[in-house]
Structure formats: structure tokens, C-alpha cells
Amino acid sequence: MPKRVADEIAALPEPRGPLRRPCADLSRRVRLLAPLLDHLPASSSSSSSTPLADALGAARDLLRKTRDGSKIDQAMRGDAFLDEFAGVNRQIHLALDALPYNTFHMPQEVQEQVALVHSQFQRASTRTDPPDTQLSMDLAWALTDNPSDPALLTRISHKLQLHTMADMKNESIALHNMVISTAGEPDGCVDQMSSLLKKLKDCVVTEDHANDALTTRSASIKHRSPIIPDEFRCPISLELMQDPVIVSSGQTYERSCIQKWLDSGHKTCPKTQQPLSHTSLTPNFVLKSLISQWCEANGIELPKNKQNSRDKKAAKSSDYDHAGLVSLMNRLRSGNQDEQRAAAGEIRLLAKRNVNNRICIAEAGAIPLLVNLLSSSDPRTQEHAVTALLNLSIHENNKASIVDSHAIPKIVEVLKTGSMETRENAAATLFSLSVVDENKVTIGAAGAIPPLINLLCDGSPRGKKDAATAIFNLCIYQGNKVRAVKAGIVIHLMNFLVDPTGGMIDEALSLLSILAGNPEGKIVIARSEPIPPLVEVIKTGSPRNRENAAAILWLLCSADTEQTLAAKAAGVEDALKELSETGTDRAKRKASSILELMHQANEDSLKGNGH
């Protein structure tokens, strides 16, 4: 039953609308539970009434409700919906708490993956992300402004992903169904929602009519074409620009024209005759948008690029056409440091913008070229290159290409010697690549853990957290736990634990909890006088930190009576009793187990004194 529900969730279409991020996050976490669901005992896997089955069913129902529901309603009542997502995440977290998955016959890596996902559900059970404040402000303005600003309505429709009349029809049906299902007006705002929907419809109709009229208007004004503003003309061809780019002098030209000028060997700006400091071409997106708006307003269709089918596909799916990408690759290959720095910086920004850019940039052959630039002597080029690889790695298919290009040793070297921002982004890149299990082994073997620990100690607040996240993910693999312990991470984590002003207690406890499950890690932690800080966290920490501290203390006490007696002497019993009654299910179990160990140790001590 749980497996079937998880499969149904995986089959749901990509989420749309203002709640697409929490929907995507919830779906992703459920998919990561697949290995656990494959190993459930027969009684649990076939039952339809277990806590896990109920929780996954609630997740499926919420995702379906969000998919089919009113996008306007979801935006206007964002807080309530986000609370629902937090509640479902909490329900799954508690169901996993009650499931003794550590007793299942699963590979160690699967056990650790499930534990990691379990912790993700726990974190998601408490709301941290606020609703989209800009969208909330836009909605409030649109509901009071009559008539509404078309640009405002366009921005709202983009955020809600209500672009076409078909989208509007579905939204109208969703609002109608919402009224029927609630037998009235939910929160008394149906009139407002309907009013806003009408404004959005009018906006879409106006745009559709404008688009439909383009062909007719173009035909009727051929004999009286409007005068093209000078700033929209290329200074070389004097024709309307379709792909404006900026050169180092600050002037804007049509890409194909200025590229021909540069390819002919010219090193000056055609208009000002200034020497060009470099030949990089930066897209002028603002001017391109203004030209597009002017063309639409005047019924003019932009001239089409003369491209083959592959080029057209690339142009539609990314911010660059094929020629532009080829130019970027050539600049990466050039021996000119200024060219390489500018090109790497351009790719860094493009790869950050959208998934299509990441795909097209990788297909153009950028990854090996960027990997080569990791060895650049120019710090800024190095920073651009590693950050571009980080942004490209967001697309799953690019991860393998980056690793296959032998990037990991070079990223590790950058992590050791780069500037602070470069080191931070190198750590984030290693974390992104380590999502793939086999890469955890490769990254650890390349010597990444010692420089990550250095960043953990001397980095900026962001750098420390990037390093901690990367180390945690790498330590899901047992061999990397040993590497981290041998590299001396424990003493630094203990220092974080006793420094409440450092802001790293959460990360320290998470890392200690995973390291304490390793025999060598447990020994080193036990030698680091862990009892006083752990007891303090159990007494005064947040619910999550108390749970982790109890888990670490249980691992230490279960194999060492001296640690048990030391914890008892430190006065932790009352806090453990309170935790065993009011904590999370996992915290209750750990606290109760420690209390039993203390009771047993006390009895053994009395018997020893009696002899």
C-alpha cells in the first residue's frame, strides 16, 4: 500500500502555480523513500492503515488538491496552505519515527539515506519559508486598484502560471468547485477571487487579440511602416536589432554584425573608435525586451534568424542561439585571460537563469573548458568557473559530465587554495555532486574532507554551513566517516557545541549524530568530554537539537558504562524524563533507553559495592 501511494505521487505532473516549490519538495522527499518502501515487511507493505500509509495518503491528497485547486486561492491563503504542507511533512516524520527501519534488512547506505530523508521531513515539519511577499503585495494592489495596471496583472498571471484562456477556464472551474465543496464562500473572499480572475482574463484576451492582429496589421501597414527609433537600430547595419549585445566600450550592436567586425580582426569600437579592452559580447536583455514591446505595439514581426533546425531548437530553449554559444566556447578556449574571465562569468549567470540554459551550455561543450579554467592563475576566472559548474550541476544529467571531465580533483584543489567565495562555491559544488551515491566515494578519495573541515573552521557563516552540509552528505558513506574522524573534525564540532554565539550548534549535532554511529567516531567523541555539552543541550536546546543530543548520548552510553555514569552525575535524568514524555517519538525512545541504561548501571554499581 505505501509503495503504491508513493508511485501515484511520483506519477503526478510537475507542479504549477504559487505552491510549486513546496509541492516539488514534498514529491522529491517521498521519491527518496522508495528504497525503504521496497524493504518494508510484508505486513506493513500490504496494510492500508499503517501510520506511514496514512501519511503518504495525506501527502498524495494534498498534492492532488493543490494540482486541481484554484491558484488564486492558493496565493491569497498562502499561509494556510504552507501550514498544510508542514502538517503533512510532520505526519510523515512521525510515521517514520514509529517505524523501526533500522531493524530492517537493508544495505547500510539505504539505512543512512532513509535517516537523511527522515531528518529532512523533520525540518520541513516546521515552516521556515514565508509566502511570496511580492505576490501578496501585487494581489492586494490588484484587488484595490480598478482598473488594474496591465503590467501588474501580467506579473500576477506569470506567478500564478495562468497564461492562456485554457488556464483561465481551469481556474474558473476550480473556483466553482471550491464554492460547491464548501457550501458557501470560503473566508468570504470568493467575490474578490472572481473579480481578480475577470481582470486576468481581460488581460489575456487583450494580449491574445494583440497577437492575433499582428499578421493583419503587418500586412496593412507595409506601405507605411513606422520609423524605427535610432536606439533600436544597429549602428553598423542600421537595421532593427533582434539580438543586441554590448561591447566593452558600452555601445550596443546586432550580434551577427559586431561578430563579423571582430572576426575580421578589428580591435576597436565601430562607432566610437575606442580600443576594445576585450571582445566579449554581453546580451542586452533590457533593450531586447524594449524592441520586442515596440514591435508588438506597431504590428511588426521581428525578422527570424537564419538557422538550421538544431539552431532554432537551441534558440527557443535558451538565452543564446547556436552562434552565440559557439562564440562563448571559443572565448573559453582562447589564451586571453580577459576573454576567458568574461566568458566564464557570462556562463555563470546564464547557467543560473534556467534549466534550458544549463542543458544547452553543457551540450555546447562548456563543461571540460570550465574544468580547465579551475587551474587558472586568475582568482576571478577561477571563481567564475567553479560557480558556473555549480550552477550547471543543478541539472541532474550534467553531474555525470562534470565528474567524467575529471573535475573533482580540481574542485578539491580550488577548495584548498581559492578565495573565500571560491572555496564556498567549491564546497557547494561538491555537495551538489555528492547527491549521486558513487560520487561520495570519489569525492572522499580525492581528499575533499580535510579542506572542507578547514572551511568549516575558518569560513564565513555561509561557508561554514556549505562545508557542514557537504561533509554531512559525504559521511553518509561509511568510508568518509573514518576520513572525517581521522582529519580531526570531532574537536571542532565539540567547540561549536559549547559556543552558542557561533550559530553552528545545529550542524555540529547533526554531524556528531552521524559520526557517532561509526566505531572510530564513537571512540573519538567519547574522548572529547562530550557529556557536559550534550547534557546542556538536552536540558535547554530546541526540540530537534535535544533529539540529536539524546541520540548521540544513547550511542555513547550503550557501549560505555563510564559515559552512562558521567551523564547521570551531570544531572541529566530529570531532563531525560521530561524528554521521554514530551519529546518527538525518536527523542522519547532515546531518552527512555538512556534512563534504562542508567538504571542498569546504578544496579551494577550497587552490586559491585556489595561484594
Swiss-Prot record:
This is U-box domain-containing protein 12. The gene is PUB12. Pfam families: Arm, PUB10_N, U-box. One of its GO terms (biological process) is protein ubiquitination. GO terms for cellular component: cytoplasm; nucleus. ARM repeats lie at residues 355-394, 396-435, 437-476, 478-517. Pathway: Protein modification; protein ubiquitination. Disulfide bonds: none annotated. GO terms for molecular function: ubiquitin-protein transferase activity. Residues 227-301 form the U-box domain. Keywords: Repeat, Transferase, Ubl conjugation pathway. It catalyses: S-ubiquitinyl-[E2 ubiquitin-conjugating enzyme]-L-cysteine + [acceptor protein]-L-lysine = [E2 ubiquitin-conjugating enzyme]-L-cysteine + N(6)-ubiquitinyl-[acceptor protein]-L-lysine.
